[in-house]
Amino acid sequence: NPSLEEDAVKFEFYAVLLIEDCPGDCCCCGRKYYDYSNATMVFLTPGEIFRMSKENTLPDKGYLLAFHPDLLFRTSLKNHIKNYTFFHYRKEEALHLSRRETEKVTCCLSNIEDELHHPIDTHSSIILSRHIELLLDYCTRYYERQFITRENKNKALLENMERLFVEYIASGRLQGGKLPTSGYMA
């Protein structure tokens, strides 16, 4: 039985993981039934500890973009990477992508890879950071879409719970001081 330390990896760099082709019944990283399921993205910051449990396995297909904070030195991204708040989200708050969004993210990652194969010069870190920044800007857009989608679903859930509670009160069952059970509200 491996210890917790053997299941944990401490990152000393930023990491962007794109996990593709999760099985249809997979509820990885907080995905809900109403979320897109084509791919999932997870973001890690330097110093963050990533834990793998026995239930979690590495994906069959995906990408990992890892970059050290030093890469951002003397770039505009260094000054505002803290604005990409999703780097501090819990794993359960991962980004779930549609097919079109996955294609756009994959294109951004491909552009980063192309730049990495270019001979290094005085422009390399700036161009790389701009490609990374574009990727992160798309992720911001997709997270905002996910928040809107979830807000609508959560609003519908709350409206349904309110309707059930009103029905419960109208039936007279609350008079005895007995609150509805979670089973009733489900």
Residue ranges and their predicted role:
Residues 86-134, 138-143:
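Amphipathic alpha-helical segments enriched in hydrophobic/aromatic residues interleaved with Lys/Arg
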Residues 70, 138, 142, 164:
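Phosphate/oxyanion-binding loops and surfaces in catalytic or ligand/nucleic-acid-binding neighborhoods
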Residues 10-13, 129-136, 158, 162:
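Generic structural concept
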